[in-house]
């Protein structure tokens, strides 16, 4: 990747709507929602908010918010006509862990299986069955919703799968494994671009893949913070012919959101 000092900066404004999260235990006491674990709203990562199309028969309000606990057993749904709320909770999971095609119970350590290369960054806390980080998009061409989500594999690796829905309520998972966890997608000039765990980037022309993964070293150290830091959670969006990446890093204290712009090219080396 080459620096491009001639790129004009993106001038935008980020407005925090409220002091408290849209989804929290204070707003939705767990005991008021059947089957919701006590801590289900305490550790949410990677929610998706989208304006629902009129063709979706499961549309509850103008906005659907899909979310899950970072170590949770389901993907959930809240809905509202306004971003500021009030939000209501759909009582049933839209994708339970048991139906996710990932491990549904915590595995025991197996010395014969090598640990994933990212385990050191998590202090060994990784053998927990979960389904998390839904990234939901509208596929107008096929009148469906597509959702990237991740879970645990035997041996401790975490990977991403795709689930689809024609109503916005019932999602059907697909078997193929697409790549690392924490997919975030955006479309630009007919291509779907992806950010993932550790700041990995990818691209595909179909929601189902296959995914063309960028080299791990694509992002320079002054962005990733290597070797002392590591990109953890990122989000990518397209605007004015460029990709805009926001992310946090393991090792930053205090933890913060960072931002960079990317100008895509056909060859990864020309980015």
What are these regions (language model features)?
Residues 1-133, 137-232, 238-271:
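Beta-rich carbohydrate-recognition and catalytic domains
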């Amino acid at each position: 990747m080459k620096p491009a000092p001639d790129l004009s900066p993106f001038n935008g404004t980020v407005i925090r709507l409220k002091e408290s999260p849209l989804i929290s235990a204070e707003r939705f006491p767990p005991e008021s929602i059947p089957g919701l674990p006590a801590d289900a709203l305490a550790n949410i990562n990677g929610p998706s908010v989208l304006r629902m199309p009129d063709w979706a028969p499961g549309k509850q309000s103008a906005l659907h918010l899909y979310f899950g606990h970072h170590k949770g057993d389901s993907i959930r749904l809240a809905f509202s006509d306004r971003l500021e709320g009030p939000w209501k909770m759909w009582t049933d999971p839209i994708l339970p862990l048991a139906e996710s095609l990932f491990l549904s119970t915590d595995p025991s350590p197996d010395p014969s299986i090598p640990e994933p290369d990212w385990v050191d960054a998590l202090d060994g806390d990784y053998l927990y069955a979960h389904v998390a980080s839904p990234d939901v998009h509208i596929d107008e061409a096929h009148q469906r919703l597509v959702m990237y989500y991740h879970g645990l594999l035997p041996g401790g690796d975490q990977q991403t799968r795709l689930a689809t829905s024609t109503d916005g309520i019932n999602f059907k998972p697909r078997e193929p494994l697409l790549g690392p966890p924490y997919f975030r997608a955006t479309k630009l000039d007919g291509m779907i671009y992806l950010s993932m765990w550790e700041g990995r980037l990818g691209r595909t022309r179909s929601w189902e893949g296959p995914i063309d993964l960028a080299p791990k070293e694509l992002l320079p150290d002054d962005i990733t913070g290597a070797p002392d830091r590591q990109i953890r959670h990122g989000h990518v969006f397209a605007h004015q012919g460029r990709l805009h990446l926001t992310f946090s890093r393991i090792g930053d204290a205090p933890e913060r959101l960072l931002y960079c712009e990317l100008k895509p090219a056909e060859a990864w080396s020309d980015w």
